[in-house]
Amino acid sequence: MATIKEIKELLVTVKELESPIFLELEKDNRSGVQKEISKRKRAIQAELDENLRLESMLSYEKELYKQGLTLIAGIDEVGRGPLAGPVVAAAVILPKNCKIKGLNDSKKIPKKKHLEIFQAVQDQALSIGIGIIDNQVIDQVNIYEATKLAMQEAISQLSPQPEHLLIDAMKLDLPISQTSIIKGDANSLSIAAASIVAKVTRDELMKEYDQQFPGYDFATNAGYGTAKHLEGLTKLGVTPIHRTSFEPVKSLVLGKKES
């Protein structure tokens, strides 16, 4: 009779819920064997569910494949809302029908998984472009226009250039056909890939800024207006990376000028 360890090793090779191996092993009434069978079935079901989820996030891409297009770039940005730091956009062209396990809207990916999935995108993407627009430009042109500039910069770095753009809730003035998708990072794998690249890139930048400007907790809050960040603003004042067109930074700058 096979040991439970041997059965566990055998079950790892089973990829289908209908496998005859399950039928055979279910005759073994040892509780340890039954536990391993249940565990493996749950793992297979989870893989099937994940594959279906990824498949559903390729619906926009598949419509474009039918038109003969394969160089499809997903575009997304991170950092429209913070009080400090740049807005960062990424453009990513994935291979046809590429499915990266765990890839999703970056806001739905556990933080501990960010780097792993970022690396998987880096490894599998045909091309990646990153656009970074700093706080000074944001203050000059407004955050909406700055976001478009970041996206255009990211797209310009792609090689080969894309045949079509899938963009998260925005239209760009570019001579490339494009589709604007509401909640695109949750509905398109290409946009989700851009989302995680932009997120990790910006988070790393804000960690560097945390070293340059301690006291604002940038490494944790990424420039968003958390209690620690606002406390830092009150105690230490405005840094060169703060957006002076955003409140409460704007009022602090005006108050300093008037005093």
From Swiss-Prot:
Residues 70-258 form the RNase H type-2 domain. It catalyses: Endonucleolytic cleavage to 5'-phosphomonoester. The keyword Cytoplasm applies. Transmembrane segments: none annotated. Keywords: Cytoplasm, Endonuclease, Hydrolase, Manganese, Metal-binding, Nuclease. Signal peptide: none annotated. One of its GO terms (cellular component) is ribonuclease H2 complex. One of its GO terms (biological process) is DNA replication, removal of RNA primer. Its cofactor is Mn(2+); Mg(2+). It is found in: Cytoplasm. Manganese or magnesium. Binds 1 divalent metal ion per monomer in the absence of substrate. May bind a second metal ion after substrate binding. Pfam families: RNase_HII. CDD domains: RNase_HII_bacteria_HII_like. The keyword ATP-binding does not apply. One of its GO terms (molecular function) is manganese ion binding. A divalent metal cation binds at D76, E77, D168. Its EC number is 3.1.26.4. Gene3D superfamilies: Ribonuclease H-like superfamily/Ribonuclease H. Belongs to the RNase HII family. Endonuclease that specifically degrades the RNA of RNA-DNA hybrids. This is Ribonuclease HII. It comes from Streptococcus pneumoniae (strain CGSP14). The gene is rnhB.
